[in-house]
Amino acid sequence: MSTPEYLDEAAIRAILERQRAAALAHEPWSAEQRGERIDRAIDLLVRHERALIEAIGADFGQRSPTFSRHSDVLSPLATLKQTRAELAGWMQPEPRPVPRGQAWVEYQPLGVVGIVTAWNVPANMVFKGLAGALAAGNRVMLKPSEFNPQTSALIARMLAEAYAEDEVAVVNGPAEVGQAFCRQPFDHLLFTGAASIGRHVLRAAAENLVPVTLELGGKSPTIISRSADLASAVGRIIAGKLMNAGQLCVAPDYVFVPQESVDAFVEIARKVVSRLLPSLADNPEYTAILNQRHYQRLQGYLDEARGAGVELMELGAAGDALDPALRLIAPTLLRDPPDRLQVMQDEIFGPLLPIKPYRELDEVIGYINARPRPLGLYWFGSDPAEEQQILRRTCSGGVTLNEVMHHAALESLPFGGVGGSGMGAYHGIDGFRTFSHAKAVYRAG
């Protein structure tokens, strides 16, 4: 089999320059023209739904078709349709009060936006990023993850059907292609991925003073209050953790449980997994770990915890032998692992859930605040005073109360991190503004 040929840095730069020249040669796209380009993306997702689900499944080895349809087809479709419906309103100049004359803000396209996406929900990130960038009137260059080769190749073919290269272009290839991509003088760069890579992206962008939005993830804590309905809370936490086998940047990473409720948490969790996944070994709805590297990483966490004497509790059908070749890992609870273990240092990104027993809320808040600021934080309870303590005394990219991850799915809320979990935000009007220049205009009276 011949080795694929990838674009070198000069070829990537040439695409950018063609896109920039096309943007400068004409007036910015009108609301109607932007809407028509968004309609093309909608049409692509509708026509290629089955192919996308199959390609993503092939890249994972095994991936829940139900989850793929919701996360990588229906969710970006909803984003595109909502963007299409609202973009004309977003584009309107905003009057600002002045003592005399007139003042307003106009939202102007930046020019060429670069988007680098991760592997865990590949089509979701491509089309959601595309929605905001096109709504703002930009040309777009995309670098999908090299860890989804079949999906990335399909997305490149799909977008080439619908867009001229000077409108939307896809650059595929291994890590060195991604590095060359991030060195380009974009007008804005959106990167989704690991914090370790995000640091390199930020350095590369700084050479050209490219503004960057980073969505990096982190260890998103979950807190169950003594005021919570425990059965409801555990059901929602476990259901969220099972999505994509925990391979989501906003997945609940570890959970604080009142110390007297830990045993009850474990028993409820067992029942929830048995109900949602009666079997694991032969269940196409249970997602595999993407590749061997991540599988070994997660097994390493378990081996280290086991060696440290941590109680590990596998959830699922008893005696369900999982073939390592399929890269399936049973949902596993870890009872109070020491903070020195890697499972409590790294973003888990898998179906492992450490349980942290606690006595008082202050110790929970202190623990969270002593660590890098997470992308998400989840609190379950009915005590308004405690809810306010969580909201006021912790800092995270977003918060979902009495559920997990929902803040990240809503187009009406900005999605992004803070501190170690990222910078900037997109989705909905916030994405439109991220990918626009807010130009101040004053007319003398």
PLM feature spans:
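ALDH superfamily catalytic-core signature
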Residues: 6-8, 197-337, 401
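N-terminal Rossmann-like NAD(P)+-binding subdomain of aldehyde/semialdehyde dehydrogenases
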Residues: 1-104
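Residue-level signal for inorganic ion chemistry
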Residues: 34, 80, 137, 168, ...
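Rossmann-like NAD(P) dinucleotide-binding subdomain of oxidoreductase/dehydrogenase enzymes
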Residues: 96-232, 358
